[in-house]
């Protein structure tokens, strides 16, 4: 089984002990959509924050972090989800390939070192003219009633230069083709329909995981984020969070966004909502068993662990990326088992929710294994507990 991914891959600078109630943070919060100010739970570009604040970014990040040094980790929905698959499915016949873009600098070398310790085969276009993309992650573990929240400042760097022309043809000859966080690669993001068409023509299943699209949020704060209608139809499974779903659909709430996706022709989707219920749906024409619009509870097992010992909560960074990875794990497992030909969307929610929950227990998106199979061992008890929870919820809904 072959999985290929293209999209966001960067270095995360993690500031885990921020306080969103600090005067400095509050003074830099956005007051008008797209104005360049910080967005709690969202993303802004460093260059726009500089304009908003009237100060250089180096000074701003020093103030926001109170001068503390950050932890460093690999980030990005495309690469983190793919590494999660390779770690959890290490003993199965699965190969994972990634293509991305970096600068010829220290951060680019660091990215290759991180990935080199995994089973993912990665190739990069390396530019000497632009820095490696980075994201400064401001985490407040006490936000949202102790559930934790993170806000992002992105330095786009080389990521703005990647187009479909640089992506090798062999990457499309795959069983699963994943696009993750392409909004942070603006030129490539504009070619989503072309990328999905190439993958579908090669016979691949297509999975798209979205990310906050600040470029288009700034460009048109009131309009829908662009995503061509044909691209929706070419996306076998769309995975996004509620904020992204609302802005992609131009609606105001999660259910309206879901109904808009259905009308737009998306075959199947999963919409996460932080610590709130997950919403999923699959049409009769999708690769999944027909699934009515259904709410699924988040994983209670992880909530119980954190309630019993709040010190277990590291941060929420990478939860969405690992959720996407868990979804891909589920689909890959089902394809390997070759049951009746149709996929189970609840199983995708199960593995996604368990994987996203596990990410709360370590810093950043990438889990650094000390031995092969370590992440799988940590994940499986969560999967088992969450499966029981979802089965009970399903049985109750049937009554």
Predicted regions and their residues:
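Active-site nucleophile and cofactor-binding loops and adjacent substrate-binding regions
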Residues: 69-78, 103, 126-130, 317-318
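Conserved phosphate-binding/catalytic loop of the ribokinase/pfkB sugar-kinase fold
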Residues: 123-127, 135-186
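Conserved beta-alpha-beta core of the PfkB/ribokinase-like small-molecule kinase fold
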Residues: 176-260, 266-268, 275-278, 283-285
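Glycine-rich phosphate/adenosyl-contacting loop at the front of the ribokinase-like
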Residues: 1-97, 312-313, 393-399
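Conserved phosphate-binding/catalytic region of the ribokinase-like
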Residues: 3-17, 23, 28-34, 198, ...
């Amino acid at each position: 089984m072959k999985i290929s991914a293209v999209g966001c891959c960067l270095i995360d600078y993690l500031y885990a002990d921020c306080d969103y109630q600090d005067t400095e943070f509050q003074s830099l919060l956005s007051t008008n959509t797209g104005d360049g100010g910080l967005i709690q739970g969202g993303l802004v570009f460093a260059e726009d924050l500089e304009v908003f604040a009237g100060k250089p970014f180096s000074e701003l990040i020093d103030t926001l972090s109170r001068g503390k040094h950050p932890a460093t980790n690999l980030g990005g929905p495309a690469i983190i989800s793919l590494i999660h698959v390779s770690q959890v499915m290490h003993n199965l016949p699965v190969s994972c390939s990634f293509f991305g873009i970096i600068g010829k600098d220290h951060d680019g070398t660091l990215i290759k070192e991180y990935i080199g310790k995994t089973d993912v085969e990665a190739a990069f276009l390396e530019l000497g003219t632009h820095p490696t993309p980075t994201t400064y992650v401001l985490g407040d573990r006490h936000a949202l009633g102790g559930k934790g929240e993170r806000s992002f400042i992105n330095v786009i760097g080389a990521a703005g230069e990647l187009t479909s022309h640089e992506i090798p043809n062999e990457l499309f000859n795959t069983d699963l083709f994943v696009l993750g966080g392409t909004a942070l690669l603006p030129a490539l993001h504009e070619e989503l329909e072309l990328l999905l068409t190439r993958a579908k023509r090669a016979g691949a299943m297509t999975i798209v995981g979205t990310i906050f699209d600040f470029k288009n949020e700034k460009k048109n704060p009131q309009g829908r984020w662009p995503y061509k209608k044909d691209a929706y139809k070419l996306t076998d499974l769309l995975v996004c969070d509620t904020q992204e779903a609302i802005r992609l659909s131009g609606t105001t709430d999660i259910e309206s966004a879901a109904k808009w996706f259905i009308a737009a022709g998306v075959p199947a989707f999963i919409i996460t909502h932080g610590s709130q219920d997950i919403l999923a749906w699959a049409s009769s024409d999708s690769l999944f068993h027909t699934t009515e619009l259904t709410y699924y509870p988040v994983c209670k097992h992880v909530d119980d662990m954190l309630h019993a010992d709040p010190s277990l909560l590291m941060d929420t960074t990478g939860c969405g990326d690992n959720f996407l990875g868990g979804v891909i794990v589920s689909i890959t497992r089902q394809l390997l088992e070759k049951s009746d030909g149709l996929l189970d969307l609840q199983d995708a929610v199960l593995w996604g929710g368990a994987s996203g929950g596990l990410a709360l227990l370590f810093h950043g998106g990438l889990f650094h294994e000390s031995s092969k199979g370590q992440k799988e061992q940590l994940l499986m008890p969560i999967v088992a507990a969450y499966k029981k929870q979802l089965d009970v919820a399903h049985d109750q809904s049937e009554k």
